[in-house]
């Protein structure tokens, strides 16, 4: 995997990891904590969607069509773009209030959750980025951590 990074506001670092053969980028945004010796927190989201069948939609699936009563329809908005936005809005609001986390927080967007994660996330966890930093918690769907 190749990688490159950009820094935003001198606090948030965004890294792009891409499997050169597949063109499926993993995006990791990092908010460095005040105590880097502590284990990191990883919040995961995905940017892929299940296949679209346009004839089953009232509005074009990728249009983010807003109805007169305020509903917005778009493929992937609930699974799972909204969660990634929640993460970033929470970070933005916490930073605005002057909050500094003790632990480093990584927000990830992976490209292939809907098809098993073998081309993106699986390759990303094999990189040096993960070594000694993160202990992912993986649960089966609908497990609710039971």
Regions from the PLM with identified roles:
Residues 71, 78-146:
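Acidic/histidine-rich catalytic neighborhood of metal-dependent amide-processing enzymes
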Residues 1-75, 96-101:
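Acidic/His- and Gly-rich active-site-bordering loop/insert found
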């Amino acid at each position: 995997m190749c990688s490159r990074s950009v820094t935003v506001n001198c606090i948030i670092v965004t890294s792009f990891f891409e499997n050169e053969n597949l063109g499926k980028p993993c995006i990791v945004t990092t908010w460095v904590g005040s105590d880097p010796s502590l284990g990191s927190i990883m919040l995961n989201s995905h940017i892929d969607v299940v296949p679209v069948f346009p004839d089953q939609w009232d509005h074009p699936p990728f249009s983010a069509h807003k109805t007169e009563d305020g509903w917005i329809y778009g493929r992937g908005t609930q699974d799972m773009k909204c969660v990634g936005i929640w993460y970033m809005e929470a970070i933005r609001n916490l930073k605005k209030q002057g909050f500094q986390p003790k632990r480093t927080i990584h927000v990830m967007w992976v490209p292939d959750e809907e098809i098993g994660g073998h081309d993106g996330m699986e390759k990303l966890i094999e990189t040096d980025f993960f070594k000694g930093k993160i202990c992912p918690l993986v649960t089966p769907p609908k497990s609710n951590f039971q």
